[in-house]
Amino acid sequence: MDKKASRLRRATRTRKKLQELGATRLVINRTPRHTYAQVITADAQVVASASTLEKEVRAQISNGGNKEAAQLIGKLVAERAVEKGISKISFDRSGFQYHGRVAALAEAAREAGLQF
C-alpha cells in the first residue's frame, strides 16, 4: 500500500465515523499548489467554502501552497460558516497529518469562531 492509498483509507474511515454521528464537518484538501476547505452538513450540503483559487484570496497571497495561505483560508471559511449560523463542527483532515498547513488552517478557523 502506497502513501496516497493509506491517506485515502484513513480519510474514508474518518468520514464514515462522522457520517454515523451526523456531525457537520470542516473538510480540507491540500495539493502542492493550493488549499481548499468546505463546511459540509450531515446531509451532504456544502454550507461554506474557501480556496486559494478565489480571486479575493489570490490578491492577498503570493503562493497558495504555504501556511500563510492556509491561515487565510481557515479564517475565511470560519467567517462564512459563522455567518450561516454554524459554529460547532468536527474537523475532517482528509487523512492528512495534523501538521503544517493543516494545523495552520485549523488554528485560524478556531480563532475565527469555529469550535471543534
Swiss-Prot record:
Is DNA damage given among the entry's keywords?
Answer: no
Q: Which GO terms describe its molecular function?
A: 5S rRNA binding; structural constituent of ribosome
Does this entry carry the keyword ATP-binding?
A: no
For this protein, the record's InterPro entries field holds: Ribosomal_uL18_bac-type, Ribosomal_uL18_bac/euk
The organism sits in which domain of life?
Bacteria
One GO CC annotation, please?
cytosolic large ribosomal subunit
Alphabetical keyword list: Ribonucleoprotein, Ribosomal protein, RNA-binding, rRNA-binding
Q: What does this protein do?
A: This is one of the proteins that bind and probably mediate the attachment of the 5S RNA into the large ribosomal subunit, where it forms part of the central protuberance.
Q: What is the name of the protein in this document?
A: Large ribosomal subunit protein uL18
**Species this chain originates from:** Psychromonas ingrahamii (strain DSM 17664 / CCUG 51855 / 37)
From the broadest rank down, the organism's phylogenetic lineage runs: Bacteria, Pseudomonadati, Pseudomonadota, Gammaproteobacteria, Alteromonadales
